[in-house]
Amino acid sequence: MLSAARLQFAQGSVRRLTVSARDAPTKISTLAVKVHGGSRYATKDGVAHLLNRFNFQNTNTRSALKLVRESELLGGTFKSTLDREYITLKATFLKDDLPYYVNALADVLYKTAFKPHELTESVLPAARYDYAVAEQCPVKSAEDQLYAITFRKGLGNPLLYDGVERVSLQDIKDFADKVYTKENLEVSGENVVEADLKRFVDESLLSTLPAGKSLVSKSEPKFFLGEENRVRFIGDSVAAIGIPVNKASLAQYEVLANYLTSALSELSGLISSAKLDKFTDGGLFTLFVRDQDSAVVSSNIKKIVADLKKGKDLSPAINYTKLKNAVQNESVSSPIELNFDAVKDFKLGKFNYVAVGDVSNLPYLDEL
């Protein structure tokens, strides 16, 4: 079986906090606090990115330097990441040091000082660097544009702070107050004893976080199809398609993504990447073609779209996808379960399209 018998998984609630843990006979543990505070929930463009960059700055009880040095002495590391759904605070450490890291993450969530000088000297420069790096990748640019034209708001919000909309320190504090609540976060541990984690969480500042409400969307997001955008870019050219996916069709598009990027498909050599981004209320399937030569990109995207419009039998990739999905779920605290029973065929209908790079020599949507 894919689920190792030695792994114990439990999920419960500590004063309305969702806590999950898996134990395993290894020395290294990880602790993650996943907050539903990603860019889709942003009250202003980029505020989630700036809040994410404020994590592990000075708190009311520890300086940022002290936090890093304490963790280094214990041999551990901290990291804070952002995506469209979550701000995730993560620590990796030796198993016996769990109490320290529970308290450290709780301290960040509950007592970040939000000093004005940190915004100008640390947070904004780091956020601008993130944005500059992302802007150098034409695939990343195409992906962001696909989200924007597909969903417009919510999932279509900019992932990173670009400085277009002014975000003040008070805006960041207010957003933190909105998302850093008991009902809006999940605590998970890998190679952690479940009973110990629940006890340490209960004894930490996490249990005193203010009450609020879960921001998790319960309804399917509004989306648009047949949209197009074109972005001039010096470098490689990219042609990308995006398809919004409802919850019932997630399994089909998961199989499609694996099929198109494997040796099972004759199109795999033409495709740079294809994936399904899954959310609790749906998803977005994206496919990218990238090359230095815009003529190659143009030819390949036309071949791919024409072939997908004819229809594809996905059955050869179902078992492969089941295996891959099961392995991935082993490392996810709250996986989105997929039912592959009804997956058979796929035929491309309406989709959204983005061209990045030498757009004068890339096709338009109505040419595909």
UniProtKB/Swiss-Prot annotation:
Keywords: Electron transport, Membrane, Mitochondrion, Mitochondrion inner membrane, Phosphoprotein, Respiratory chain, Transit peptide, Transport. Its main location: mitochondrion. The modification Phosphoserine is found at residues 141, 168. GO terms for biological process: aerobic respiration; cellular respiration; mitochondrial electron transport, ubiquinol to cytochrome c; proteolysis; proton transmembrane transport. PROSITE patterns: INSULINASE. It is a peripheral membrane protein. Residues 1-16 form a transit peptide. One of its GO terms (cellular component) is mitochondrial crista. One of its GO terms (molecular function) is metal ion binding. Transmembrane segments: none annotated. Pfam families: Peptidase_M16. It is found in: Mitochondrion inner membrane. PANTHER family: CYTOCHROME B-C1 COMPLEX SUBUNIT 2, MITOCHONDRIAL, METALLOPROTEASE. Component of the ubiquinol-cytochrome c oxidoreductase (cytochrome b-c1 complex, complex III, CIII), a multisubunit enzyme composed of 10 subunits. The complex is composed of 3 respiratory subunits cytochrome b (COB), cytochrome c1 (CYT1) and Rieske protein (RIP1), 2 core protein subunits COR1 and QCR2, and 5 low-molecular weight protein subunits QCR6, QCR7, QCR8, QCR9 and QCR10. Component of the ubiquinol-cytochrome c oxidoreductase, a multisubunit transmembrane complex that is part of the mitochondrial electron transport chain which drives oxidative phosphorylation. Belongs to the peptidase M16 family. UQCRC2/QCR2 subfamily. Present with 35700 molecules/cell in log phase SD medium. This is Cytochrome b-c1 complex subunit 2, mitochondrial. It comes from Saccharomyces cerevisiae (strain ATCC 204508 / S288c).
